[in-house]
Amino acid sequence: MLKQLLSKCAEGKALTEDEAYAAMNIIMSGEATDSQIASLLSMLRLRGETVDELVGFVRAMRDRMTAIEASDDVIDTCGTGGDGAATFNVSTAAAIVISSLGVKVAKHGNRAVSSKSGSADVLERLGIDIQTSPSAAKQALETKGLAFLFAPLYHAAMKHAAGPRKEIGFRTVFNLIGPLANPARCKRQVVGVYSTCYAEKLAEAMRRLGSEHVLFVTGRDGLDECSIAAETDVVELKDGAIRRFVIAPEDAGLPRGELADVQVRDPEESAALLEAVMAGTAPESAINIVALNAGAALYAAGKAETIAEGVAMAKEAILSKTAYEQLQRLRAKEVIHDA
């Protein structure tokens, strides 16, 4: 069947949602060859993925993933990656801040692929355990308010696409759909996107998949998160409606900062800067970019009425050491019994 679907794509035609679902299922079952996978990814990238295709692919990923039980108010802060900006792990830092304010965070992430430091890499350097099973993640979510969901553990079937993805080297549909398949089935998210041209398609796909409040953010300086050094394009899905707007740091009560203050060379530097942010001793730009992204997440979570209000809450959590205390709680070792 995959050959017929590849032929359809080669003719410039889009796949239906069900065809996309079938194609992804064939890939994840290990029945597709590396050449077939690379061909499909290349054709989709050249033509541009449709909403139907995105929905079909995400449905297939969700159906095959190892899911964890979580309440509807759980949120994720996750990016597509691939922005090449060499920034420290802002979304991971934001996750720690918002979890310190009582918002449960199921942080979906991986090791570095194109970045200097993936969320798994920096958490290890900080001495924070990466939960090794769904039951451990569920317990961490309940007891500490934050669980790290290491993507390969929950999306084991994606290993079949790993080789072709690495060999072709460019961004593919997998970069876009990864953040949309959180194992906790989060309905509220902040998703960093490497190019804002994809944001409306992703928002429409998530609307059809039942999401409640999602912000797709792209800094105009190329960051796949809210930028402190430039305006940020935001596409918002909220209660079934989709709108686009632009937010500048000044709109959230923050001075414009320097990108150089948030760039790092390796996971060790990223961990050190993240810890300095939590301690309130980092450069102002680093503290403020975390506050800005945490503020967006607090807004998506329904904890704040506006992004600006969320930023004020996040800044207070950092300056009052509430976030630093949460970092220490996350570091504390405890016996987690696997079910």
Curated annotation (Swiss-Prot):
<feature type="binding site">
    <location>
        <position position="225"/>
    </location>
    <ligand>
        <name>Mg(2+) 2</name>
    </ligand>
</feature>
<comment type="subunit">
    <text>Homodimer.</text>
</comment>
<feature type="binding site">
    <location>
        <position position="119"/>
    </location>
    <ligand>
        <name>5-phospho-alpha-D-ribose 1-diphosphate</name>
    </ligand>
</feature>
<feature type="binding site">
    <location>
        <position position="225"/>
    </location>
    <ligand>
        <name>Mg(2+) 1</name>
    </ligand>
</feature>
<dbReference type="GO" id="GO:0005829">
    <property type="term" value="C:cytosol"/>
</dbReference>
<dbReference type="InterPro" id="IPR035902">
    <property type="entry name" value="Nuc_phospho_transferase"/>
</dbReference>
<comment type="similarity">
    <text>Belongs to the anthranilate phosphoribosyltransferase family.</text>
</comment>
<keyword id="KW-0822">Tryptophan biosynthesis</keyword>
<feature type="binding site">
    <location>
        <position position="110"/>
    </location>
    <ligand>
        <name>anthranilate 1</name>
    </ligand>
</feature>
<dbReference type="GO" id="GO:0000162">
    <property type="term" value="P:L-tryptophan biosynthetic process"/>
</dbReference>
<dbReference type="InterPro" id="IPR017459">
    <property type="entry name" value="Glycosyl_Trfase_fam3_N_dom"/>
</dbReference>
<feature type="binding site">
    <location>
        <position position="165"/>
    </location>
    <ligand>
        <name>anthranilate 2</name>
    </ligand>
</feature>
<dbReference type="GO" id="GO:0000287">
    <property type="term" value="F:magnesium ion binding"/>
</dbReference>
<keyword id="KW-0028">Amino-acid biosynthesis</keyword>
<feature type="binding site">
    <location>
        <position position="79"/>
    </location>
    <ligand>
        <name>anthranilate 1</name>
    </ligand>
</feature>
<dbReference type="Pfam" id="PF00591">
    <property type="entry name" value="Glycos_transf_3"/>
</dbReference>
<dbReference type="Pfam" id="PF02885">
    <property type="entry name" value="Glycos_trans_3N"/>
</dbReference>
<dbReference type="InterPro" id="IPR036320">
    <property type="entry name" value="Glycosyl_Trfase_fam3_N_dom_sf"/>
</dbReference>
<protein>
    <recommendedName>
        <fullName>Anthranilate phosphoribosyltransferase</fullName>
        <ecNumber>2.4.2.18</ecNumber>
    </recommendedName>
</protein>
<keyword id="KW-0460">Magnesium</keyword>
<keyword id="KW-0479">Metal-binding</keyword>
<dbReference type="GO" id="GO:0004048">
    <property type="term" value="F:anthranilate phosphoribosyltransferase activity"/>
</dbReference>
<comment type="function">
    <text>Catalyzes the transfer of the phosphoribosyl group of 5-phosphorylribose-1-pyrophosphate (PRPP) to anthranilate to yield N-(5'-phosphoribosyl)-anthranilate (PRA).</text>
</comment>
<dbReference type="InterPro" id="IPR000312">
    <property type="entry name" value="Glycosyl_Trfase_fam3"/>
</dbReference>
<comment type="pathway">
    <text>Amino-acid biosynthesis; L-tryptophan biosynthesis; L-tryptophan from chorismate: step 2/5.</text>
</comment>
<keyword id="KW-0057">Aromatic amino acid biosynthesis</keyword>
<feature type="binding site">
    <location>
        <begin position="89"/>
        <end position="92"/>
    </location>
    <ligand>
        <name>5-phospho-alpha-D-ribose 1-diphosphate</name>
    </ligand>
</feature>
<keyword id="KW-0328">Glycosyltransferase</keyword>
<feature type="binding site">
    <location>
        <begin position="107"/>
        <end position="115"/>
    </location>
    <ligand>
        <name>5-phospho-alpha-D-ribose 1-diphosphate</name>
    </ligand>
</feature>
<dbReference type="InterPro" id="IPR005940">
    <property type="entry name" value="Anthranilate_Pribosyl_Tfrase"/>
</dbReference>
<keyword id="KW-0808">Transferase</keyword>
<feature type="binding site">
    <location>
        <begin position="82"/>
        <end position="83"/>
    </location>
    <ligand>
        <name>5-phospho-alpha-D-ribose 1-diphosphate</name>
    </ligand>
</feature>
<feature type="binding site">
    <location>
        <position position="87"/>
    </location>
    <ligand>
        <name>5-phospho-alpha-D-ribose 1-diphosphate</name>
    </ligand>
</feature>
<feature type="binding site">
    <location>
        <position position="79"/>
    </location>
    <ligand>
        <name>5-phospho-alpha-D-ribose 1-diphosphate</name>
    </ligand>
</feature>
<feature type="binding site">
    <location>
        <position position="91"/>
    </location>
    <ligand>
        <name>Mg(2+) 1</name>
    </ligand>
</feature>
<feature type="binding site">
    <location>
        <position position="224"/>
    </location>
    <ligand>
        <name>Mg(2+) 2</name>
    </ligand>
</feature>
